[in-house]
Amino acid sequence: MRLPREIGPIHFVGIGGIGMSGIAEVLVNLGYAVQGSDASDNYNLDRLRKKGAKVSVGHKAENVDGAEVVVVSTAIKRDNPELMAARERRIPVVRRAEMLAELMRLKSCVAIAGTHGKTTTTTMVATLLDAGGLDPTVINGGIINAYGSNARLGAGDWMVVEADESDGTFLKLPTDVAIVTNVDPEHLDHFKTFEAVQDAFRHFVENLPFYGFAVMCIDHPVVQSLVGKIEDRRIITYGENPQADVRLVDLTPMGGGSKFKVAFRDRKTGAVHEIPDLMLPMPGRHNASNATAAIAVARELGVSDEAIRSAIAGFGGVKRRFTKTGEWNGVTVIDDYGHHPVEIAAVLKAARESTNGKIVAVVQPHRYTRLQSLFEEFCTCFNDADAVIVADVYAAGEAPIDGIDRDHFVAGLRAHGHREVVPLPAAPELAGIVKGLAKSGDLVVCLGAGNITQWAYALPGELNALG
């Protein structure tokens, strides 16, 4: 049995969130009655209103009036008035992943998982399948620049979704094809141990049907180890590793992008097929790797080499993934979602490839628990930055932790040998500090999952106002 079309209003608590809004948008486009609320207004709410969803700002018990089912994310606390009202009225309450799973049952699916790179890789898979005429439905964890949205309803048989592992619910997703980009220590507030994280990814792949397949990056040692533990499922490996089935070869930075070749090796015959002269208009080895994963899936699903090459060359990217927000006196300002040490190091390495000038990193640590559990890694991931400006921790609802704050982080970076580390007293002072550090040809890279994106977009104008 599938989600009946005649079901009454589906209510989303936190409908403006990047994960929730995509599901809501696809449901609206499918003809379901959708309503919801969020704590504050934003771009996603406005987009959903225009599509016909009934959206409220603020959480109130009466918002769930008439709802047949209530959808919540893990960000919603048990004392939320709408969640409490739903339970008092015996309205079914489901997690975001459960509703996503219902949508996935309508199509054949590709699900992209991994600690980092999910959103970009999801966008790349969608772009390639679209170029191949497969017209996929897409539900992503970021705004796809080509769509102006994180979701779209396609007429084809395939759905491409980002599989969020943060609360373990990605194990509920019924996918036919899986990508695993990497597995690092993250979300330990939920999983408790890194071993539990690895077990979850192993189960994610083992949940595939016998006719499906997984595309896994063996450049990452943990993923390579997982490949060796998974039995009875078809695995296609990818990466720069010479043992990979789909190999990234001859990677050359080209200004703001990369040129490379992808080689496919047939395990049975040993024959090699190559797609040469691929041009990706995004810098960074990590983005070329993500593209290789997407290419592996696309070719497996019948997309031609010519369509792949054209789509990669025209790739429009994702909002908040190395996004240029403006310039000032030859200084370029970049906004990036990177908030884990591995992501930060990759972004700064991509920045280093993109300029001969200095790299000024502005970091807003996201969550006290993440900074605490990965403190050593955070203190060593800024090596490609010539200067680091450190803002206060963005709490994301967490309580402060003694000894885990901006000043201790600044001290940690200095203790690990970083020569230029500047604490940011307050956001309005950012432009003045940047003006003193950056000159023409330099890159200012704003990093974090909090409200630093607003600073990144305001910064060029603030710098111009200073002269």
Swiss-Prot record:
GO terms for molecular function: ATP binding; UDP-N-acetylmuramate-L-alanine ligase activity. It is found in: Cytoplasm. ATP binds at residues 114-120. Pathway: Cell wall biogenesis; peptidoglycan biosynthesis. Pfam families: Mur_ligase, Mur_ligase_C, Mur_ligase_M. Keywords: ATP-binding, Cell cycle, Cell division, Cell shape, Cell wall biogenesis/degradation, Cytoplasm, Ligase, Nucleotide-binding, Peptidoglycan synthesis. Cell wall formation. It comes from Bradyrhizobium diazoefficiens (strain JCM 10833 / BCRC 13528 / IAM 13628 / NBRC 14792 / USDA 110). It catalyses: UDP-N-acetyl-alpha-D-muramate + L-alanine + ATP = UDP-N-acetyl-alpha-D-muramoyl-L-alanine + ADP + phosphate + H(+). Belongs to the MurCDEF family. InterPro entries: Mur-like_cat_sf, Mur_ligase_C, Mur_ligase_C_dom_sf, Mur_ligase_cen, Mur_ligase_N, MurCDEF_pg_biosynth, UDP-N-AcMur_Ala_ligase_MurC. HAMAP family: MurC. This is UDP-N-acetylmuramate--L-alanine ligase. One of its GO terms (biological process) is cell wall organization. It comes from the Bacteria. One of its GO terms (cellular component) is cytoplasm. Its EC number is 6.3.2.8.
